[in-house]
Swiss-Prot record:
Main location: cytoplasm
Annotated gene: queA
SUPFAM superfamilies for the chain: QueA-like
Biological or metabolic pathway of the protein: tRNA modification; tRNA-queuosine biosynthesis
Reaction equations catalysed: 7-aminomethyl-7-carbaguanosine(34) in tRNA + S-adenosyl-L-methionine = epoxyqueuosine(34) in tRNA + adenine + L-methionine + 2 H(+)
GO cellular component term of the entry, any: cytoplasm
Membership in a protein family: Belongs to the QueA family.
NCBIfam families, sorted: PRK00147.1, queA
Subunit structure of this chain's protein: Monomer.
EC numbers for this chain: 2.4.99.17
HAMAP family membership: QueA
Gene source species: Pseudomonas fluorescens (strain ATCC BAA-477 / NRRL B-23932 / Pf-5)
Gene3D superfamilies: QueA-like
Protein's name according to its UniProt entry: S-adenosylmethionine:tRNA ribosyltransferase-isomerase
InterPro entries for this protein: QueA, QueA_dom1, QueA_dom2, QueA_sf
Amino acid sequence: MRVADFTFELPDSLIARHPLAERRGSRLLTLDGPTGALAHRQFTDLLEHLRPGDLMVFNNTRVIPARLFGQKASGGKLEILVERVLDSHRVLAHVRSSKSPKPGSKILIDGGGEAEMLARHDTLFELGFAEEVLPLLDRVGHMPLPPYIDRPDEGADRERYQTVYAQRLGAVAAPTAGLHFDQPLLEAIAAKGVETAFVTLHVGAGTFQPVRVERIEDHHMHHEWLEVGQDVVDAVAACRARGGRVVAVGTTSVRSLESAARDGVLKPFSGDTDIFIYPGRPFHVVDALVTNFHLPESTLLMLVSAFAGYPETMAAYRAAVENGYRFFSYGDAMFITRNPAPTAPKDLAPEETV
């Protein structure tokens, strides 16, 4: 399967660089999996597509202000993007500078603070901080807006690039499908008889990395930490018993649930995942999906294509562009029910469709 099969033309004007005034103000493109039918709605119309007895699964990770600016002791400027907090004083980070810092070198953080380069692990740098990392990031860190939001972060991003139900610190990118939900909408969902459950997947900066191979099968996913608790397993079982659907809010919730059910049975799981879902891969847990619009040739677009079917997904994206939907993290959303017989690009080998 070719990565190029997942490209589409996107006018720059459709990239959402700022959030709307209200979280729930986005548009919603619905895609019916069994028929491929599309409908243009508002995000608050999501309520009409949910049924009593359904279970919505959210990712409760919390974005940390993971971007730091500073300079080396030699005076050279650099930028740090924390990828993972290892403990109270150490992180793994991407470092951008004219020359990479060497082990033992000191880094002075803008706004106050100091770090030491401890070791290099492939493309990541292990950094040690004199003070505790999370309070330091909260004090002088910047929200790690995605590269396609090509502007400096603003004070408002600390609130809006965060879900209202975010709890567990550790993400360096938001689970963006959740950004559309405000507290009144969550209350309305509960009032309809829809249950909720929460997984945790700390989204890493690797989510924005382009696929650099020509064929999908040659791509290796980055690792991210996740946790699916026994409470989620029990909630899914109860949902199945009452005939409800499991509705994942965001691709990170999908990847969490499907990682915990790789052998076909959902079990509690805590640890790293590198699951790569693309056309031909089965889904064991998720029946419906709320998701934003994703980048061309991205692994997230491939996941949606696996869920809804390749031709149906690409047709939906063409319709979204034609109708002026806003794309990416601060953009509009889709509600998709799973296609029971999804098809893939034409050159998918038969053995890969099972």
